[in-house]
UniProtKB/Swiss-Prot annotation:
Organism (species): Pleurodeles waltl
Bias type Acidic residues, positions: 18-43
A single GO molecular function term of this UniProt record: zinc ion binding
Binding site for Zn(2+): C239, H242, C261, H267
Domain notes: B box-type zinc binding domain is required for targeting this protein to lampbrush chromosome loops and for normal functioning of this protein in the oocyte.
Domain (Tudor-knot): residue spans on this chain: 48-101
Effect of C178F: No effect on intranuclear localization
UniProt protein name: Zinc-binding protein A33
Cellular-component GO terms for this entry: chromosome; nucleus
Top-level lineage group: Eukaryota
Localization, UniProt: Nucleus; Chromosome
Zinc finger region(s), B box-type: 234-275
Reported impact of H267N: No Zn(2+) binding. Inhibits the targeting to lampbrush chromosome loops and to nucleoplasmic particles
Bias (Basic and acidic residues): 126-151
Length: 625
């Protein structure tokens, strides 16, 4: 009988034995006859309940117990059921119409387990007794067979909880409209390049990209994971499509293949490697990835270390600023305590803003280091994999992911954040900053500076008191001594400083261009000079009436809220600080930080006259407070 032909291999596969026993064959034959009798007495079920188990006619025209999973309506408004066949070695689900659900009576689990005993009961009594006797002998004498059966059941259970795409236990399982389950990540990836959304299992085209989280399945996976987490899940060694051994690796698709896959249209004109050769090729690629990753790791670790050092330095700088603030305000006695508290409050506010970005960047760098360390660990784990099948599974996507992370290198935002504290505000001449409010209290006087005529460019004219300078189109005949500027239109102060703290002011008025700053004693005076700290110049300038710059290397554009008429200059020699202020309201303009090893001189430049628009002189301020 046709049914007997199908049932016998199925029973042999489930029992795990290939023994040809005459009594067993007779028993199986009798069971098939009972199945035929049972089918003759069946009719389509009148009502079908989701979650219940019924006899269902399979696509190969055989009967098998099936659990009803879900239902749907076809375009013709006919009802269909998505069923799961119980007890098969391979998971098999499908949609069936109502006519194929043949038994309305719910089949209990005990009935399923005893199906063979019940069907054998319709055979003659002597054969039934012989079969039961034979069964008891098998149960009593074949413990290994029982163990294999339990293992098979566990494998079936694990198979039901395995994503058909990644072949691993479900992660965030979702269920499609057709009833098939996949990992959320797997189905998203499968649909990325698809023109239409369809189920990878049954190929049913879906109306939209839609799925639902399967929480029940997720809970089952969690429970199953407890039992299998210590077991090694070996990759398949046979092709799912052709049931042939996987002997090749497709370089174009990055997948394992059998010899039939190689000759199929799907892999037409593709390049293949034997598995062992592919292991060698991709192992070399992984090895080549380790070194760049380690280099990137070292770079991130260095940045992390540098950032930590910068944060420590800024913390120390904040402490120094606070001490300076407290010391200066102590000189102003008790009635200035309120102003002191306000300054400390502003410092703390700037501290929070300054350290926030740097500490956030430090966290990013720490995360980068941890991420790269994890990538190295994952790569090393893959390199240590001895099983070629496991090694090559998803190897191409794995390497592409590693390459992508390496190409990123140190992300653009993962650079050293080095924000400067407003030293000009908190560590400057605080008595002058509050001078406008406290003229009756502050009486230190400005540094009495004069200009050195032996350093002045020949087109510069100094006042009789050597306190102002202006440009003239007539070049004066002056001795070309080593101190004199030959090309740059500059003049130095007569008094230099090699210690202490000093403050002075320069009146710039409405001039459209000027330079104000400091110059080292050994700085170059001849020819064209690049004015920056590397060459011994710390200065700011104005050009074209509104373009302010700090002469760093490279120069920095300064955005001032108002155009100053006087520039204040503060030098803290031991502190390595030169700060510039809008002397009208003592708002800080810019601060240079460094270390000084020789005497420093004030320097001025009135610049060119600009057709009379910039003819005003620069003046050193000697007014008492």
């Amino acid at each position: 009988m046709a049914n007997s032909t199908v049932a016998e291999p199925e029973k042999m596969e489930q029992s795990g034995t290939c023994e040809e026993d005459e009594e067993e064959e007779n028993m199986e034959g009798d069971e098939d006859e009972c199945d035929d009798d049972e089918e003759e007495n069946m009719e389509p079920a009148e009502t079908v309940t989701i979650g219940s188990t019924y006899k269902c006619r399979r696509s190969d025209n055989t009967l098998h117990a099936a659990e009803i999973i879900k239902t749907r309506k076809t375009k013709e408004n006919a009802e269909e059921f998505y069923v799961h066949y119980v007890g098969l070695n391979r998971r098999q689900n499908e949609w069936v119409d109502k006519s194929r659900v043949l038994q309305a009576k719910q089949i209990k689990t005990e009935e399923l387990n005893n199906t063979e005993d019940e069907t054998n009961g319709v055979s003659d009594q002597s054969e039934g007794k012989a079969a039961r006797s034979n069964k008891r002998k098998i149960e009593d004498g074949d413990g290994d067979q029982k163990k294999r059966k339990v293992d098979d059941e566990e494998d079936d259970f694990t198979e039901d909880l395995t994503c058909p795409l990644c072949r691993s236990l479900f992660k965030e399982p979702v269920i499609l409209e057709c009833g098939h389950n996949f990992c959320k990540h797997c189905i998203d990836k499968s649909w990325e390049s698809a023109s239409a959304f369809s189920c990878p299992e049954c190929k049913e085209v879906l109306t939209e990209r839609k799925y639902t989280t399967n929480r029940v399945l997720a809970n089952l996976v969690k429970k199953a994971a407890v039992g299998v987490k210590d077991k090694d899940v070996k990759p398949k060694e046979k092709c799912d499509e052709h049931d042939e051994r996987l002997k090749l690796f497709c370089k174009d698709d990055g997948t394992l293949a059998c010899v039939i896959c190689r000759d199929s249209l799907k892999h037409s004109n593709h390049n293949f490697l034997p598995i062992q050769d592919a292991v060698g090729v991709y192992r070399d690629q992984l090895i080549a990835l380790v070194s760049p990753l380690e280099t990137t790791m070292k770079e991130n670790q260095k940045l992390k270390c540098d950032q930590s050092q910068k944060i420590s330095l800024h913390r120390e700088n904040i402490v120094d600023c606070k001490k300076h603030i407290e010391c200066e305000f102590e000189k102003l006695h008790q009635f200035l305590r309120e102003k002191e508290a306000k300054m400390v409050e502003d410092l703390n506010a700037e501290r929070e803003g300054l350290l926030k970005d740097m500490e956030a960047n430090l966290v990013k760098m720490t995360d980068n280091c941890e991420f790269i360390e994890e990538a190295i660990s994952t790569t090393q784990s893959r390199l240590n994999e001895s099983d070629p099948i496991a090694f090559l599974t998803d190897i191409k996507s794995f390497i592409e992911k590693c390459c992508e992370e390496h190409r990123k290198g140190v992300p653009a935002e993962s650079v050293l954040v080095n924000k400067e504290l407003s030293q000009g505000r908190f560590k400057g001449p605080l008595q002058y900053i509050i001078w406008k409010e406290l003229k009756s209290v502050v009486q230190p006087g400005l540094a009495p500076l004069t200009l050195d005529p032996n350093t002045a460019h020949p087109n510069l004219v100094l006042s009789e008191g050597l306190t102002s300078v202006k440009y003239t189109d007539t070049k004066q005949q002056l001795p070309d001594n080593p101190k004199r500027f030959s090309q740059c239109i500059l003049v130095l102060g007569a008094e230099g400083f090699d210690s202490g703290k000093h403050y002075w002011e320069v009146e710039v008025g409405n001039k459209t261009a000027w330079d104000v700053g400091m110059a080292s004693e050994s700085s170059n005076r001849k020819g064209k000079i690049k004015l920056n700290p590397k060459n011994g110049y710390w200065a700011i300038w104005l050009r074209n009436g509104n373009a302010f710059k700090a002469l760093e290397s490279p120069s920095k554009t300064l955005n001032l809220t108002s155009k100053p008429s006087k520039i204040g200059v503060y030098l803290d020699y031991e502190g390595g600080q030169v700060s510039f202020y809008n002397a009208d309201d003592m708002s800080p303009i810019y601060t240079f930080n460094g270390s000084f090893t020789e005497k420093l001189y004030p320097y001025l430049s009135p610049f060119l006259q600009d057709s009379g628009k910039n003819a005003e002189p620069l003046k050193l301020v000697h007014t008492k407070l």
